[in-house]
């Protein structure tokens, strides 16, 4: 087994702001993918499929990090903290609700 960390960060935009939120999240990709320990960092949109009928927020980040330490460093980067404050905390942000979960394969 590895010490990789798998993060699923899902977001629900406020009414009418889905595309704006998606673009704001996409803007985080180029800088994050260059971080030490980042293996994968991809923002995705929910699609419908007859073999996948579960419920989810419409926008999801799929992240893989080399270690817990690499993930923690990422979470403490100023641009990540700024995104969460601007869009998840402040009233005029794009995010209605969000959920961040981390997993290990150990």
Over which residues does each language-model region extend?
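Short amphipathic alpha-helical coupling segments at ligand-binding clamshell hinges
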Residues: 20-24
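Glycine-rich beta-strand-turn "strand-cap" elements at beta-sheet edges
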Residues: 2-3, 42-54, 83-106
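Short, surface-exposed ligand-recognition loops at beta-strand->loop->(often short) alpha-helix junctions
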Residues: 13-18
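Short, glycine- and small/hydrophobic-rich beta-strand elements in well-ordered beta-sheets
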Residues: 30-60
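An amphipathic, aromatic/His-enriched active-site/gating alpha helix that lines ligand/cofactor pockets
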Residues: 27-39, 64-100
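Active-site-flanking beta-strand signature of metal-NTP-handling nucleotidyl enzymes
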Residues: 5-11
């Amino acid at each position: 087994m590895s010490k990789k960390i798998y993060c699923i960060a899902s977001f629900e935009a406020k009414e009418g702001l889905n595309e704006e939120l998606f673009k704001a999240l996409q803007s985080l990709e180029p800088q994050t993918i260059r971080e030490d320990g980042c293996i994968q960092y991809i923002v995705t949109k929910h699609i419908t499929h007859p073999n996948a009928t579960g419920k989810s927020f419409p926008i999801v980040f799929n992240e893989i990090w080399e270690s817990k330490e690499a993930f923690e460093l990422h979470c403490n980067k100023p641009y990540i903290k700024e995104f969460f404050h601007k869009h998840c905390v402040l009233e005029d942000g794009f995010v209605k609700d969000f959920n961040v979960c981390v997993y290990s394969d150990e």
